[in-house]
From Swiss-Prot:
Any one GO MF annotation of this record: phosphopyruvate hydratase activity
Cofactor binding: number and manner: Binds a second Mg(2+) ion via substrate during catalysis.
Record protein name field: Enolase
Cofactor names: Mg(2+)
PROSITE patterns, alphabetized: ENOLASE
Enzyme Commission number(s): 4.2.1.11
Signal peptide: none
Recorded family membership: Belongs to the enolase family.
Pathway participation: Carbohydrate degradation; glycolysis; pyruvate from D-glyceraldehyde 3-phosphate: step 4/5
């Protein structure tokens, strides 16, 4: 047993300069855990509630002192003395203490900070790296990095409709080789854009954010960059998209404002079909809005044997919503974000449910990040085979990629790179 001795929260800043929560948790055997909570720019309505202060005179209303107070004055007294290694009991207590379906009283950012801090303290107490503590001896698969090399949507100014254009370097023997390829394509893309007279400023997640005429133009430049870097599009490196369609969906009209026009779901489905035929796309995240269950089921039936359709806003890492998607055949892949559901235990439940039902899982960062590397360890621990954590730029993104390099080295000959097996769509390129 590693009894919790103290819990303390403070307000810090994330990668966008917005306040977030840091929690420090100490146990009686000298272990210490640090919980750093990320934050999203485009968020699903069904996500657990992120508690913000709302005082416009302080950090423009984005302060989190209320969440900090909830940890220090409400959660801490209840969890002191509990066993940090009993993650389920700790998380269940905080959920019960909150008493709402979406953690809408204490705040998911307060609860997750404590949940993560306890996880790290427990791993340190057990003298195990985090991936080994979570996954036991089974965790050994290094994930394919889905690298967001062009930013649009809510992550950039002058944006295209599509929020993230990612490369997926799956045609390699090791993670380190795949990372190298991704980095080389990223740097090559900068030169490709410069030659076209396009800006190479960066978006929230480190990808380039030039002003594009069409969504397809972004894909064409990425294809050029892959080839110019010496790699084969499709065979070695595929393309993944995060459309984030809820961001440009109008509830009143039931239409998507896309490419400058109001489009219905049939138009969007046809657009995706043509895109998949034209480019080596292996993954599309949030192709339809977060309550468009029937449209999700339709596209999964039409194209789900060719690529993965990843539910982010649709599932929000919530086992209840994921179960609905499984039953309806809506989507075939889960995006995993710890702060969408708000506890480590519920996150692990969602991954397990996805795996048991033949869904892939992609562990993800948020646009407002910290130097925390939990998602790297989590991806290996649960052998998810996929991670998305931005471009190979900006310290908070690089930290995750570097942590995976460390894990690969630690695992040695037992390390396995997910590669082609991570994606259904890759089969047609083998």
């Amino acid at each position: 047993m590693a009894a919790i001795e103290s819990v303390y929260a403070r307000q810090i800043l994330d990668s966008r300069g917005n306040p977030t929560v840091e929690v420090v948790l100490d146990t009686d055997d000298g272990a210490r855990g640090l919980g750093l909570v990320p934050s999203g720019a485009s968020t699903g309505e069904a996500e657990a509630w992120e508690r913000r202060d709302g005082d416009k005179s302080v950090y423009q209303g984005k302060g989190v002192l209320g969440a900090v107070k909830a940890v220090n004055e409400e959660i801490a007294p209840k969890v002191i003395g509990m066993d940090a290694t009993d993650q389920r009991a700790l998380d269940d207590l905080m959920i019960e203490l909150d008493g709402t379906p979406n953690k809408g009283r204490l705040g998911a950012n307060a609860i997750l900070g404590v949940s993560l801090a306890a996880l790290y303290a427990a791993a340190e107490s057990a003298e195990l790296p985090l991936y080994r503590y979570i996954g036991g001896t089974n965790g050994h698969v290094l994930p394919v990095p889905n690298m967001n090399i062009m930013n649009g949507g809510a992550h950039a100014d002058f944006a295209t409709d599509i929020q993230e254009y990612m490369i997926s370097p799956y045609g390699f023997q090791t993670y380190s080789e795949a990372l190298q390829a991704g980095v080389e394509v990223y740097h090559t893309l900068k030169n490709v854009l410069k030659k076209q007279g396009l800006a190479t400023g960066l978006g929230d997640e480190g990808g380039f954010a030039p002003k594009m005429k069409t969504n397809e133009d972004s894909l064409k430049y990425i294809m050029d960059a892959i080839s110019a870097a010496g790699y084969e599009p499709g065979k070695q490196i595929g393309i993944a998209l995060d459309v984030a369609s809820s961001e440009f969906y109008n509830k009143e009209t039931g239409k998507y404002h896309f490419d400058g026009e109001d489009r219905d779901s049939e138009y969007m489905l046809d657009f995706y079909e043509k895109l998949v035929d034209q480019f080596p796309i292996v993954s599309i995240e949030d192709p339809f809005q977060e309550e468009g269950w029937e449209d999700w089921a339709k596209i999964t039936k039409a194209l789900g044997d060719r690529l993965q359709f990843v539910g982010d806003d649709l599932f929000v890492t919530n086992p209840v919503r994921l179960k609905k998607g499984i039953d309806m055949g809506a989507g075939n892949s889960l995006l995993v974000k710890l702060n969408q559901i708000g506890t480590v235990s519920e996150t692990l439940d969602a991954i397990e449910l996805a795996t048991k039902n033949g869904f892939t899982s992609m562990v993800s960062h948020r646009s407002g990040e910290t130097p925390d590397t939990t998602i790297s360890d989590l991806a290996v621990a649960k052998n998810t085979g996929q991670i998305k954590t931005g471009a190979p730029a900006r310290g908070e993104r690089i930290a995750k990629y570097n942590r995976l390099l460390e894990i690969e080295e630690e695992l040695g000959s037992t390390a396995e790179y997910a590669g082609y097996s991570a994606f259904k769509a890759c089969r047609k390129y083998m």
